[in-house]
Amino acid sequence: TTDADNAALVPATIVGQLRNGLGQCLTSQDPKGSDGTPVWNSNCAGNSAAQTVIYEGDGHIRIGDRCVDVLGGYTKEGTVAHMWTCYPALESQMWDLNENGQLKNRASGLCLTIPGDTTRGATQAVISQCSDTSKSQRWTLTEASGQ
């Protein structure tokens, strides 16, 4: 399937949490933070603003008023993900959720990953080669109740 086909797997906009295969949620260090705020894993907490994501049909993942972005738009494996001002056409901020549950960055073709498949909280997310065996790359978008 193509990335465009995969994008069709997700409705236009979903509000909820992104939980990986290790039971950890994608979390912004500070949902009201500035550009460069780290994005990492942590235990999932019900209505945490730091874990409330808005997955938009164009591929943007918002937490608060910022988007999950790849540092500097780099496409090198191991580059960290962080929060940045949202730009409509910036591919380093666009993620396709594929049929394997991986969030594939459009600019790099790499997947959003918690290094080492760890459940140790506050491990900053990076982009890395997509792997069918990495539980930290298996994301489930859980819609918030009432949405």
Predicted regions and their residues:
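Aromatic-rich beta-strand patches that line glycan-recognition/binding surfaces
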Residues: 37-44, 79-86, 124-129
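Short coil/turn segments at the loop-to-beta-strand junctions that recur within blades
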Residues: 45-48, 87-90, 131-134
